[in-house]
């Protein structure tokens, strides 16, 4: 009986944490001549206007055989980016720069907290340096987006020394809370 309760508790805990961050946008980038897989989205999906949320950022050296797969065998976590990268959260004409904190449970993860205050398009822009190269990389929410949002393999220069090789997935824009009477 106790074993069954522990098993069910573990499943419940996993399902709650797994559903809290399922929609992120992945970009395969060449920064200063080196490949990086950067993934950005909201900490809680979908984000609700007025509720605590935040930006969740992951950084890896990609597996050359499967470069957009954040679970690929040859992927390597990138640490220390909280010292060189910040995020600008923009909603229309209003923006705020926030610092990242490294996750204690995942060395590839960086987080920051904010409260979405409007139902509008939010842009998370990573700024700072990666591989000693200045970056300015934007991720824009898309209403109803998720990990299955179609990708794009068109190369594009994002900023000097930064080329986007591929992009896939997406994260949803904030939606209003529904009140239950």
Please give the residue ranges for each predicted region.
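C-terminal segment of classical bacterial N-terminal signal peptides
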Residues: 11-20
